[in-house]
């Protein structure tokens, strides 16, 4: 159902922090024209913690209407409140999204049983397709494979975004009826070659067409070509993470003329000492800026 290059889309903002809805429309069109396989909106890269309820509604509605079922739209709906997560997941479904991406609760530090009950409760409350999201580096909470297997018994839990970079987890879970998606660009090739279906990618923001081709190659199991394409993209794997995501990728896109320069506090624009490194990596992958 969900596979290939699924871009973790940035939310374009003006320098005063206001969302640029006109530019968002242009950005979505750019991805449609450049073979992106799906859009993941209002996730980590989309600065979801700083987006208001009114803005969420407007963003989801605009993107759903524009895409018009050409490619899947996945909306980040996770929070550390079960009730709030259910509300946002319900909203995504009502506005026409294809799936919800639900991160493990952050700050609360639930047990594995707590995680099971949390995801089971949401799955039973809202019938939209749901993708679990495990990113312990941000949440201080690790969704273990044995817990994923329990949650996967819910019929509308259809996938897992695994951002630990642990390839063994793919091998443990590939027998399950789940779309396994990497959430870590640096290890995405090995993830897909081990049985993953695709990537929810930060890097795909700046190189959508090459990243789509790379995902097709890796998912098909063409090891030699996948390594070649991965090497071509590799300058971005470090440079786009020199500071907290999405700081570097938004700066890169602004340098490319794709989006304005805005980002919301507590995130700040890319530190000047990293400008040359990010610019050089863009040039290494053939982007003029």
Swiss-Prot record:
**Location in or out of the cell:** Cytoplasm
* Keywords, sorted A to Z: Amino-acid biosynthesis, Cytoplasm, Diaminopimelate biosynthesis, Lyase, Lysine biosynthesis, Schiff base
This protein's GO CC annotations:
cytosol
Quote the record's binding site residues for pyruvate. 45, 200
* Example GO biological process: lysine biosynthetic process via diaminopimelate
List, alphabetically, the InterPro entries matched. Answer: Aldolase_TIM, DapA, DapA-like, Schiff_base-form_aldolases_AS, Schiff_base-form_aldolases_CS
Q: Sorted alphabetically, which HAMAP family does this protein's record hold? A: DapA
Designated name of the protein: 4-hydroxy-tetrahydrodipicolinate synthase
Question: What is the source species?
Answer: Coxiella burnetii (strain RSA 493 / Nine Mile phase I)
- What would be the name of the gene that encodes this protein? dapA
